[in-house]
Amino acid sequence: MKRESSTQLRAGFTTGTCAAAAAKGAALMLRDQCLCDQVTLRLPTGISATFRLEGQEFSSSSASCFVVKDAGDDPDITNGAELHARVTVPPPLPLAQGDMVEITGGTGIGRATKPGLAVAPGEWAINPVPRRMIQEAVGEVFADRRVLVQISIPDGELRAQKTLNARLGILGGLSILGTTGIVRPISAKAWTDTIDTALDVARACGCATVVFSTGRTSELAAQEWLKVRGARFDFGDQESGNADREPGTMYLEPLPEEAFVMMGDHVAHALRSARERGFHQPVIACQYAKLVKIACGYENTHAAASDMDLARLRAWAVEAELPSRVVETIASANTAREIAVSTGFDPALLTLTARKALQASQGHATGAHPLFVVADYGGRIVFHSLPAENNA
């Protein structure tokens, strides 16, 4: 995959693709009893790609090699990781599965510990599509023999510390991921996939609601604030998995770690995904600038995808007859942060902005009724729109 121009970004390959390529290379060396420098692999999209093999070793009973992951121009924590595969035949122990190709994890591969993931608790975090890719790649070489394939990433546990794996319930290393086999550069899909997975875990763990955050500062502030204050949420509905609770009733319940989901700038996707999973009243923790962008109706609040429309904010303030000092501050300010700080996080202004944000959110996801928690720039909660039962 060569760069075609100075502006075109280069795609890369998923961990699943690299693991399958390494497994095929090891299988070929084991069968042919000679070194193999590269392999060609057919991806789920139907295209083929060729991969260079490194660290090749083989004996009469096993072979191993690795592929260095190239994520292209995608800022991926797994870029440069070594995806190792060892193929053994006959397997040292009877295979636990009925498949001709059994796949296990080794060093640096995580295990699932929570429900709601693509693999069951206790299983190696090798997702279904990569698993199938490995089985098919090795099956091409050993069509009628049972073999054991072990996938490992030497520094996988260290790399995993920079991911959300632990929060999602994947411990001990990285996940082997991918659906198309290709990593699209600077794509939002990796982030939105993580949001979806986190919501699946939250639902499977029985969370009453979820708390989205736009950044780590607002998330930490919300976690601490909710832990100290406690919170009541209207989550009595059939879809949420709490059918024994009456709709419209407020319940006091602590929120577990799984309830906190980092959505970043992907507000519309997060709201729709939450609604699809029965979370109709999520909490959104953010700073004031993000609240303004949510109120303006942007699906994505990143600076590259949204403008800070202070003129609209001023029009809302005038229409709501907010104090003249607030209106004047908005008119003269250059940033939402300046407005928030200069007005002392004026309660009427924040209430107005949260109301507009609620209306905009319902445009993204019909039936959604998010609650808002706003943190100042020192990590302290200065506003919330939680129900009256929470006003201690």
UniProtKB/Swiss-Prot annotation:
Molecular function (Gene Ontology), one example: cobalt-precorrin-5B C1-methyltransferase activity
InterPro entries: CbiD, CbiD_sf
Group of enzyme by EC: transferase
Keywords: Cobalamin biosynthesis, Methyltransferase, S-adenosyl-L-methionine, Transferase
Pathway named in the protein's UniProt entry: Cofactor biosynthesis; adenosylcobalamin biosynthesis; cob(II)yrinate a,c-diamide from sirohydrochlorin (anaerobic route): step 6/10
The enzyme's E.C. designation: 2.1.1.195
Substrates-to-products reaction catalysed: Co-precorrin-5B + S-adenosyl-L-methionine = Co-precorrin-6A + S-adenosyl-L-homocysteine
Keyword NADP applies: no
Keyword rRNA-binding carried by entry: no
Biological process annotations from GO: anaerobic cobalamin biosynthetic process; methylation
Similarity annotation: Belongs to the CbiD family.
Protein name: Cobalt-precorrin-5B C(1)-methyltransferase
Gene symbol of the encoding locus: cbiD
